[in-house]
């Protein structure tokens, strides 16, 4: 035993890094990671297409991924980034703009992926990976070690000039490091940007897609750690709260992890214009019920029912316009 300044230096607090061991020792669950990227643009923001095209260019030469694109258009819009002749593209069209991201991911999985797929990722098209082995690392971690992973440990959130606005820890990283859950400050558990899961996990829980104003990432992440009640405003309609709690019941037993590495998040409008807090007032004002207000059409697209009021639709479109992503 060696003691210096009253501290016993041989008594170390060593924690096994199971993520590192999985990368070092596991074989990939399959040869390629199936990566879905979705885009809808009801307000035709130019920056969305620009960032999307840059994202595709960065990933198209990665030998460890198979990339798929799902594009949703509304009313009189035209398809801009997909082709009907490309077997890796899915083109969807519907009338009313609501938040379709998670619905599009699930339709991409249904219509584009091969029948024998084993791992799927869904990634926002406004990020860039600094880790050149992120896809291979993901395939290894998902081969018996984790059921679902966030594809980064840290994120550099950038301003328009690419200077640093903030640095986030990923939700999966924070959970894996046994940090205290917080939604503010330097230790904020960021639930977004990029995820992947195994086929077995997806078949069990799917992806929550009933959030017509977003927050799917947050609902999924909090469900994994049995804390989704944090996201439930007491004024929400009971049906909405119940649908989220039902998802948590399926998801809470999954093994959550992360993929080591940094991503960069590109600027597309101010955070203030996203109105992450104010937007939930729309759901409260209209007492949104996923059991009454939405259904699926013949293709599987989430669409409003007759109970979904015109004003509700207008308020959602107004929110999309107020994001002002090209500013």
Describe each PLM feature range:
Residues 31-38, 56-59, 65-69, 108:
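Hydrophobic targeting segments
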Residues 128-226, 244:
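Conserved catalytic core of nucleotide-sugar-dependent glycosyltransferases
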Residues 1-33, 41-55, 211-327:
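C-terminal catalytic/acceptor-binding lobe
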Residues 123-125:
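Catalytic metal- and UDP-sugar-binding loop of GT-A-like glycosyltransferases, i.e.
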Residues 71-117:
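Active-site-proximal specificity loops/subdomain of glycosyltransferases
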Residues 120:
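Short aromatic/hydrophobic "clamp" motif used to bind/position activated sugar donors
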Residues 70, 149-154, 259, 266:
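Short glycine/serine/threonine-enriched helix-capping/active-site loop
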Residues 42-44, 58-60, 70-81, 127:
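A conserved acidic beta->alpha catalytic loop
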């Amino acid at each position: 035993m060696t003691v210096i300044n009253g501290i016993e230096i041989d008594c170390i607090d060593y924690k096994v890094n199971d993520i590192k061991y999985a990368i070092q020792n596991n074989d990939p669950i399959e040869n390629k990671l199936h990566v879905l990227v979705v885009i809808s643009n009801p307000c035709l923001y130019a920056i969305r297409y620009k960032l999307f095209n840059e994202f595709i260019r960065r990933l198209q030469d990665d030998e460890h991924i198979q990339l798929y694109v799902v594009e949703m258009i509304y009313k009189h819009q035209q398809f801009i980034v997909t082709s009907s002749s490309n077997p890796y593209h899915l083109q969807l069209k519907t009338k009313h703009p609501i938040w379709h991201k998670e619905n599009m991911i699930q339709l991409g999985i249904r219509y584009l992926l091969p029948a024998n797929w084993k791992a799927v990722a869904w990634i926002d098209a406004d990020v860039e990976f600094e880790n050149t082995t992120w896809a291979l690392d993901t395939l290894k971690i998902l081969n018996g070690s984790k059921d679902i992973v966030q594809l980064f440990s840290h994120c550099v959130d950038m301003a328009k000039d690419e200077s640093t606005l903030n640095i986030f820890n990923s939700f999966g990283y924070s959970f894996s490091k046994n940090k205290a859950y917080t939604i503010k400050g330097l230790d904020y558990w960021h639930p977004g940007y990029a995820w992947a899961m195994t086929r077995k996990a997806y078949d069990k829980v799917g992806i929550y897609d009933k959030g017509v104003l977003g927050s799917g990432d947050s609902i999924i992440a909090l469900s994994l750690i049995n804390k989704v009640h944090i996201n439930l405003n007491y004024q929400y309609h009971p049906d909405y709260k119940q649908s989220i709690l039902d998802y948590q019941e399926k998801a809470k037993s999954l093994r959550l992890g992360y993929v080591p590495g940094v991503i960069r998040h590109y600027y597309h409008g101010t955070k203030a214009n996203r109105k992450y807090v104010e937007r939930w007032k729309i759901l409260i004002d209209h007492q949104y019920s996923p059991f009454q207000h939405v259904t699926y059409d013949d293709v599987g697209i989430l669409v409003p029912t007759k109970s979904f009021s015109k004003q509700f639709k207008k308020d959602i479109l107004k929110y999309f316009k107020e994001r002002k992503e090209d500013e």
